[in-house]
Amino acid sequence: MKIEKLGKSSVASSIALLLLSNTVDAAQNITPKREKKVDDKITLYKTTATSDNDKLNIFQILTFNFIKDKSYDKDTLVLKAAGNINSGYKNSNPKDYNYSQFYWGGKYNVSVSSESNDAVNVVDYAPKNQNEEFQVQQTLGYSYGGDINISNGLSGGLNGSKSFSETINYKQESYRTTIDRKTNHKSIGWGVEAHKIMNNGWGPYGRDSYDPTYGNELFLGGDKSSSNAGQNFLPTHQIPLLARGNFNPEFISVLSHKLFDTKKSKIKVTYQREMDRYTNQWNRSHWVGNNYKNQNTVTFTSTYEVDWQNILLKLIGTDSKETNPGV
């Protein structure tokens, strides 16, 4: 496709908001831009920006690919968002007797937005649709005149007509990728959410699964088990990696800038983790499991200024927040 188509909070409240903006917990770096003349029409400029927050355990690696195409009347930016988002997993207390709980990574969100007027718009992105594959692999190719093609696989079927390509490759066992409903020409968002988790051959279960007798059996050990509550969960090694470890996102957004229009604009990149609380409880005859969604949310945002005329990148600032810190 051608890329031009396209209130006050109560003191007694259980929700606390922790704001961490430009603190010692955040570190940033931008590499010098590298220039590559692809051919007589296209020149590629690349720079990488890293930004993280140790307290929230979120790390952004952003690759900015600026494409100057003499055969096209717009600047093109292919932005690859990668890095790491930790699940925040907190194990149960094995000594808990009749009731126990643990926290796990239920969903991860990544978004890219253009914070400017209509001079800079989001015109394409990858993945483009809901995806339930174990491993998501796609290739974006650019050719003369602003033509963008997105194909499955790491080769993407590129041929001699493609002047530039970028790939995404990430694993999401038992999770699925969805596109944010608010996606439009100014913003694109992806969600990677626990979707189909098996429990010793039973299931699949999700964050909202429910049985009238046993509740949500997502991580329940045994409904008649004689173990303590703190030991009656699915063994840790059987819990999906994204639920207890780290998610390594790789998403691509394509932004278009009108030549001779706004010289500078802002781009905002946000990484977020939603942490659920899973519980089990003995009800005098059997164990009952429950999952409580989004009990703790951490969000890390980096805002960059893009100088389209000189092809320069500047970090304006970072913002971090956490609901229910310390759970």
Swiss-Prot record:
It holds the Pfam family Leukocidin. The keyword Membrane does not apply. The gene is lukD. One of its GO terms (biological process) is cytolysis in another organism. InterPro entries: Bi-component_toxin_staph, Leukocidin/Hemolysin_toxin, Leukocidin/porin_MspA_sf. Induction: Expressed at the late exponential growth. Is cotranscribed with lukE. This is Leucotoxin LukD. Keywords: Cytolysis, Secreted, Signal, Toxin, Virulence. Part of a bi-component leucotoxin that acts by forming pores in the membrane of the target cells. LukE-LukD is as effective as the Panton-Valentine leucocidin (PVL) for inducing dermonecrosis when injected in the rabbit skin, but not hemolytic and poorly leucotoxic on human blood cells compared to other leucotoxins expressed by S.aureus. HlgA-LukD is a Ca(2+) channel inducer. One of its GO terms (molecular function) is toxin activity. It comes from the Bacteria. Transmembrane segments: none annotated. Residues 1-26 form the signal peptide. Gene3D superfamilies: Leukocidin/porin MspA (2.70.240.10). Toxicity requires sequential binding and synergistic association of a class S and a class F component which form heterooligomeric complexes. LukE (class S) associates with LukD (class F). LukD can also associate with HlgA. It is found in: Secreted. One of its GO terms (cellular component) is extracellular region. It comes from Staphylococcus aureus. The keyword Signal applies.
